[in-house]
Structures are given as C-alpha cells and as structure tokens.
Amino acid sequence: MDVVDPDIFNRDPRDHYDLLQRLGGGTYGEVFKARDKVSGDLVALKMVKMEPDDDVSTLQKEILILKTCRHANIVAYHGSYLWLQKLWICMEFCGAGSLQDIYQVTGSLSELQISYVCREVLQGLAYLHSQKKIHRDIKGANILINDAGEVRLADFGISAQIGATLARRLSFIGTPYWMAPEVAAVALKGGYNELCDIWSLGITAIELAELQPPLFDVHPLRVLFLMTKSGYQPPRLKEKGKWSAAFHNFIKVTLTKSPKKRPSATKMLSHQLVSQPGLNRGLILDLLDKLKNPGKGPSIGDIEDEEPELPPAIPRRIRSTHRSSSLGIPDADCCRRHMEFRKLRGMETRPPANTARLQPPRDLRSSSPRKQLSESSDDDYDDVDIPTPAEDTPPPLPPKPKFRSPSDEGPGSMGDDGQLSPGVLVRCASGPPPNSPRPGPPPSTSSPHLTAHSEPSLWNPPSRELDKPPLLPPKKEKMKRKGCALLVKLFNGCPLRIHSTAAWTHPSTKDQHLLLGAEEGIFILNRNDQEATLEMLFPSRTTWVYSINNVLMSLSGKTPHLYSHSILGLLERKETRAGNPIAHISPHRLLARKNMVSTKIQDTKGCRACCVAEGASSGGPFLCGALETSVVLLQWYQPMNKFLLVRQVLFPLPTPLSVFALLTGPGSELPAVCIGVSPGRPGKSVLFHTVRFGALSCWLGEMSTEHRGPVQVTQVEEDMVMVLMDGSVKLVTPEGSPVRGLRTPEIPMTEAVEAVAMVGGQLQAFWKHGVQVWALGSDQLLQELRDPTLTFRLLGSPRLECSGTISPHCNLLLPGSSNSPASASRVAGITGL
C-alpha cells in the first residue's frame, strides 16, 4: 500500500463514533450514519476496504479535495481514519438524503424548487472551479439535502485538480447519462475542462423535472455512441407547456454542445431562472414536508398516465380441483380416459420409478438438441400413466382405493365415473422384478414391491374372494433412451385463458415456479407446494411474459404496453395484500417510485408482439417489440438489471403479424427480426423476410406468399432454426439453407400440426387432438398421444395448454421432463380426467 496522507489517523473510528445504520454505497465504498460519542453530533462515515497492493492515491485525492474545500454548498470534511485495511472518511451528515432519494418518493420538483437547487449547485461549482477543481459527476444522487433544507455537493470520488498543465483532462470518467459530449469523445477531441460540470447540471435539471435523465432507457454504450456523432442534438424538456420560457432557456444554455460557447458557473448565476426573487430554503423545506407526509400531496403515478385498474372478476387464489404431488405426479384418474397411445419403433421401455427426482436448473439453450440425441439416460416414464396396445397389455392392476379400509372395497370396485378402469392403461412401479410367481402376503404383511409410500393407485386391497393378488408385470429389458414423461399434470380445472408462460426459480427457497400470462392477469404456480394453487400477481390482461434474473417482462394492459416487474416485489405485495385485505388500489398510488415493482417501458404503448433471443457471448439477451409503425430492440444490461433500448427502426409491419421472431447468426452483433417466411429458391429451403437493425436501411422480402396452415419460426441453436410451414417442419440455418449433418432436414407432418417445440433433442408437434414426438433430423415418428375429446393448444413456441372440447376449464401439464426448467416453461392442460 502506498504511503498514506499524514493527516489520516491510524486508529479505529469506532472509538470516536457509534455506527447507527448503513445509508448506501458510494463510488468506492459504503456510507454509514454515525454519532460522535463526545458531542452527540451526527456524521456520515464513508468506509473503503483496502488491499495491500491498492493504490490509495485516488482516495487521497478525494480527501485532499474535501480538506481544502470550505463552502456552504459543499459537504464539510471532519477527518479520516485508516484501520485494519479500511479507510474511513468522516464528513457532514445530510439527513434528508440525496435529491434522487427525495424525488423517487415525492415525484418531480416544482420549477421554483429546481431553480433554487440549480442556484445552490452553481454557487458550489463556481467555488470549485475557482479552486481549479472539476467535480465531473454532477447528478441528483450526488446532491444532498440536510434537515435545514440546505443543498450540498458530495461524492468527490472522481473529482480532479485543474493545474496549469492539467487544464484539459484526458480521462474518460463520469456517468454516461449526465456526461458532456466532449467527455464522451475525449479520445477524439483531446480533452475537456470544468465546463463539463455545467452540462451535467443542465441534465440534472431535466432529471429533477422528469424523474430521470434523457435517454435513460437507452443502453449507456449506445448513449456514448450517440453523443459522439456529429449530428447529435442536445436534449430538451419534453413538455413545453409545463415549464416557463426561462427554464427552457436555462436548459438550452447549459446544454450548449460546444464547450467553447458554454457559459461558466459564475456567468450562469446571473441567469433569469436562478436570479429571480423568492428562491429560499423554504421551497426545499416544503419538499421535505412532502417527503415525510407523502399522503398530503398528489400521487406521483407513473411517467405516463395509468389506465384505471378495476377489481378483477376472478379470485386471486385458485386451487386445483384435485391435489397433486409437489413433484408433478399425475392424478391416478388420468388412467380413466381412453387415449390412443401408439408405441412405435425403437420405443421399448422399462417400468419407471414411482417418484420423480428434482433436477438442478438447466438452461434450455445451453444444451444442443443434436448432442442430446447421442446421450443416454436411465430416466423413464416415472411420472405418467402409459397407455399401451392391447396385445402388449400386462395383467391389469386393481382400481385405485379411495383411502377407505380394505374391507370397504372389493375387487370389482368402480372408478369415480362409475366405470371400471380400462385394462388398456397401466401404471408401473419401481422395484425388483419377481423371479417366479408366488403367493401374496397376508393383509397384515407389506408387499415386497408396494409400500405405504407407493402411489395409492398401485395398492392392491386384500380380497376375500382371491387367494393371491395379481402380480406386477415383470421388468422388460432396459433400452437406453433420452426422455421422460410426455405430459405431467400440475393443475386441475384451470379457469384462466392463458396466453404465455415463463419459468422462474426463487433465489432463496429454490422453489420452481410457473408464471402465467392470461386474460385475467399474471398468475404464479409454485410447483413445490403440496396443493397446487394459482395466485394472482398483476391484475391486468397479459399476452406475453419472459423472466430473467428475478425480473419479469410482460406485455400487459387493455392497450398493450411493455412492463418490467420485480418478481420478488410482486410476491411481497401479494403477501401484504393477503395479510391486510383492502379495496383494490393501483400499486402506483401506494408505493414510492423507487419501490415500484411494476413499471412501464417508455415508448412501447400499443406493442403488438414481443420476442427474445440470446445475445452475443459478451452481452445479454435481446428483446424485440413490434409497435404500430416501428420495431424496437432492447438488450439486457446486467449492471442496471434491466432492458435498455439499443435500436429503433421505423417500419410499417404487416397485419396480421403471423410471424415475429429474432434470428441471430454467428458473428453478428445485432439480431434480425423475422416478420415472414416463404419457400426458398434452389439451395435454400426457406426465405426469411427480415428487418435488420445493423444496416442503414432494413430489407424485406416479398410478403405476398399465402400459407396452408399455421406458420412458426423458432431458433433452437445458433446455427439452427425450426420452421413450421405448409404442413412440414424444416430445420434450416439462419440464412435459410438446410442444416448440414441431418438425414432429413424436412419432416412432413401426418396431422394438421399447429405448433412445434424442441424438447430434449426431440421434436414435439402439437395438433388439435394430440401430440407427436419426432426424432430430430429424421422422419421417424417416435411417439404419439391422441384423444378426440381433448383440444391441445401451444402457448407460445415452447408452451402447451390442453383443454376439453366443451369445457372452458383446463388442466395444466408439462411436456417432457417434469422437473427440468426447460420443460417448466411448457405448460399443458386436460379437462375431464
């Protein structure tokens, strides 16, 4: 560690101060509220952890600036301590917090309040600049207010001396949204001076008026790129009629693009906005009173007008009509439906285990379907009743007991529907196969194959008429195969009209959940609960959902709008509402803005459709939205835990929009959005009609093609796109060429397939009355489930719902493995089982 300033005390600051609470984090460390043990005065202690090889020159610079700055608008410095590899900086405590903390509760400041703040900040900047210092990070979060309503500049972690040889800084530092153009282009233009603080003050004035700086929903790297362009226009206030001409002029002058023409802090103090009479601390005291009593003032609402939220007509909690296992084991009465389930070539299986095993979460796209084809697994149908052809049917098991004593039922017991369970359906249990037939045990003795923990439908109630109970069928020879249950029931009697689903794992409990976007709102289903229950999270029509990093994106509202929700916040609000039921009030009327769990994404009103694709290896996933006259592309930005705007292309989309999917190619920085597909030319299986974001102008193919039946485009790998078109499924590259290495890149469907999904390296095709499973890259039909009394519907590309042809209610099922997150986002349902 470098030599520390001699004025830094080498002792524990806690000998002099009592730490009261953590206030937050600064540029280099954490900030605590503390009390002087002698005087009782409150102070702020900034703690920075040090490493032996750390260069403390930057921190010494901050300390030096604080020590040498004595001004009414700059936080006072009280001393520094170095103890146990931690540097503590003691400074003035501002009890009201930062302006950012304040406006997130109170809403935007009035023009007079903004004028007073700007005047006080300009006075502090004029002093700093006279001392040859630049702040370089002026923003709402670094402007503090004390309990007396006084304004203080804080956080000098990136301040710099302006010496005779350092008049032009050559470092790239600051916050992009508040950054001056010359700072963003420092590598091109050669440096900047103290006037960059004037630009930041102008952006801060807009922030206080509009609750966020301009371009705040745009990716920060995109903001830097825009500011370095020659055609960049400085931002202005959005609502011209709301603010005075003096305020508009103040913004125009402070945001002068050329630093040579931008006025200094001293000159700006004579501006009409900040020199008007009536600017005093009373304006800020009124703001603090509103902060302490938010109910007195008007509600802050959202950035845009909220649609009126009406009490939902559907209950907030919906219980399954039958209890189901937390592992998703199907109800035993599933066996009572006459499903035709054809065993096709290569599908001999062994009897499965009678319990499911939870698997660790896995990303669907992290495993290649083609690689999965060559893998082997001992997992079998451990969660489903398997109908088989009559000629292969083993002796039937007795009917399921209804948890009555054995003497209450005989061997001829009837099912719930008054009919004997069909013998064509069987359920297998785990256990060693019998070596030879032998008499069954007496009623008081447990079966070697069935125990009290076995599935109730497998129990064999003792009979007074039979000498021995029927034996379980012997195990067949194991055939190594990939896959598990085709459908696993999760919920019975779902009344929701579901449009989309997403999977989510709770970060603390690790419980797996399903998030459902429906006409009635957003609901959640905990797959680990003993009793399946759907609980409402958001009472607004939702047609699309997607979860990432505990954030739920949704397309919600009567007029569709893209929303961002905190899933943990939605759950907490649900529990609060359940514990204290009150009249339905929009959450925006109850919560501070910083605590809002549901916020609208700006400029996405009227969004027609959304889709998501994985980003490049260095970036997060992309989200694309189809607006009325344009297409917007957003990308996940991990430091801010949100999607930010990357590009927007003005383009009139077709109506109806039958295809809307993102396509990413190897080496491409930005994806293209596919809005149509047609048969290809020689050498190409299909021709994608795309809108490209990277080119100067977008390209669109001929859109006059009419298709026979549904059309679907889904990218399943970086170099593989699955296209359902004209009754067949084609596996092509993002350019439309057939995928190499596949025996059959085009699979003709034998039914009127409406949607397809890739599950566990196999192709699942869903049609009106059934499901087909095809081998990837071949015309081999591996498995089929059909029932003319049921209607299946795929929710999105990898999601399934199945309902009765008459009843509007449905049961939720999972296709594929019952516990993998890949199958967790595929939901199905069956009625009348």
UniProtKB/Swiss-Prot annotation:
The tissues in which it is expressed are: Expressed primarily in hematopoietic organs, including bone marrow, spleen and thymus. Also expressed at very low levels in lung, kidney, mammary glands and small intestine.
Enumerate the active-site residues.
D137 (proton acceptor)
EC?
2.7.11.1
Instruction: Give start-end positions of Basic and acidic residues composition bias.
Output: 333-348
List each copy of the Protein kinase domain by range: 17-274
Assembly and partners? Interacts with MAP3K1. Interacts with FBXW8. Interacts with CLNK (via its SH2 domain).
Region Disordered: start-end pairs: 296-478
Q: Which Pfam families match?
A: CNH, Pkinase
Which residues, renumbered to this chain, carry the PTM Phosphothreonine? T165, T175, T355
Composition bias (Acidic residues) maps to: 376-385
Q: Which Gene3D superfamilies does the record match to this protein?
A: Transferase(Phosphotransferase) domain 1
Task: Give the enzyme class.
Answer: transferase
Q: Per the similarity annotation, which family is this?
A: Belongs to the protein kinase superfamily. STE Ser/Thr protein kinase family. STE20 subfamily.
Which PROSITE patterns does UniProt cross-reference here? Answer: CNH (PS50219), PROTEIN_KINASE_ATP (PS00107), PROTEIN_KINASE_DOM (PS50011)
Tell me a GO biological process for this protein: cell population proliferation
Name the chain's protein: Mitogen-activated protein kinase kinase kinase kinase 1
**UniProt PTM:** Autophosphorylates: phosphorylation promotes ubiquitination by the Cul7-RING(FBXW8) ubiquitin-protein ligase complex, leading to its degradation by the proteasome.
GO terms for cellular component:
cytoplasm; membrane
How the protein is affected by changing S737F?
A: In a metastatic melanoma sample; somatic mutation
UniProt keywords, alphabetically? ATP-binding, Kinase, Nucleotide-binding, Phosphoprotein, Serine/threonine-protein kinase, Transferase, Ubl conjugation
Q: What does this protein do?
A: Serine/threonine-protein kinase, which plays a role in the response to environmental stress. Appears to act upstream of the JUN N-terminal pathway. Activator of the Hippo signaling pathway which plays a pivotal role in organ size control and tumor suppression by restricting proliferation and promoting apoptosis. MAP4Ks act in parallel to and are partially redundant with STK3/MST2 and STK4/MST2 in the phosphorylation and activation of LATS1/2, and establish MAP4Ks as components of the expanded Hippo pathway. May play a role in hematopoietic lineage decisions and growth regulation.
